[in-house]
Design a protein with these regions (language model features):
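Intrinsically disordered, low-complexity segments enriched in glycine/proline and serine/threonine
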Residues: 33-35, 72, 170-178, 182, ...
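Phosphate-binding glycine-rich loops of NTP-binding sites
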Residues: 54
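Conserved catalytic cores of phosphodiester-cleaving nucleases, focusing on short active-site segments
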Residues: 57-59, 64-72, 91
């Protein structure tokens, strides 16, 4: 097994968006991000805890953090939705411990994007529920749609929550990320995580 310092915690969106079961990737992009699955694996190994879940990627901008979860499979029922929720909670706890910040302190600095495969036609009931919610609020069509019951996490756990199809993610977010991705911030986070591992390995 590799030593922690030999593990690469940065990877490309091409890799973090990969569906290992289907052996396909949702995002053909060379942009570098923090591979939060790898962070989680080292965290689990350090504390010798039961397997936990995590979001796929972490992006860092200035003093703000953005989790990205890629969901290529079907989101059919409460079990699938609960898995997404579990990844959110576990990832926030891991990030909180690494940064030595409470969840309250992080709430206004962390946002979340779920990228899903709209072609699978598994979102209809969630879309209907969201449209009903917006209609109930008597809001116009410009309000941001947030599917899969994730709206409740906005202002509760995250500063902002977004749910995008692959094409929406590319058009609304990817170009901005290409222009503003600061690799040095990813490297700083890697260093911080390595220090976290070293400190807790000695306790």
């Amino acid at each position: 097994m590799k030593k922690d310092k030999d593990i690469e915690y940065k990877s490309r969106l091409l890799e973090t968006s990969k569906d290992k079961a289907k052996k396909e990737t949702m995002m053909d992009s060379e942009i570098e991000v923090i591979n939060f699955d790898t962070i989680k694996d080292s965290y689990v190994q350090l504390f010798k805890i039961e397997k936990i879940n995590s979001n796929d990627a972490l992006i860092i901008r200035d003093d703000e953090y953005l989790f990205i979860e890629f969901k290529n499979g079907k989101i059919r029922d409460i079990k699938d939705v609960f898995e997404i929720y579990s990844k959110i909670y576990d990832s926030l706890i891991i990030l909180s411990n690494i940064l030595e910040k409470t969840l309250i302190e992080l709430k206004d600095r962390v946002s979340y994007i779920l990228v899903f495969n709209k072609e699978l036609e598994h979102t209809r009931k969630f879309e209907r529920a969201e449209e009903g919610f917006i209609k109930h609020l008597n809001k116009n069509s410009e309000i941001e749609r947030i599917y899969f019951g994730l709206r409740k996490f906005e202002k509760y756990c995250f500063k902002k929550v977004y749910t995008y199809s692959v094409e929406e993610f590319k058009s609304k977010f990817l170009q901005s990320l290409k222009e503003n991705n600061d690799i040095s911030l990813l490297e700083e986070f890697e260093d911080k995580f390595l220090k976290f591992l070293e400190k807790n390995n000695n306790d």
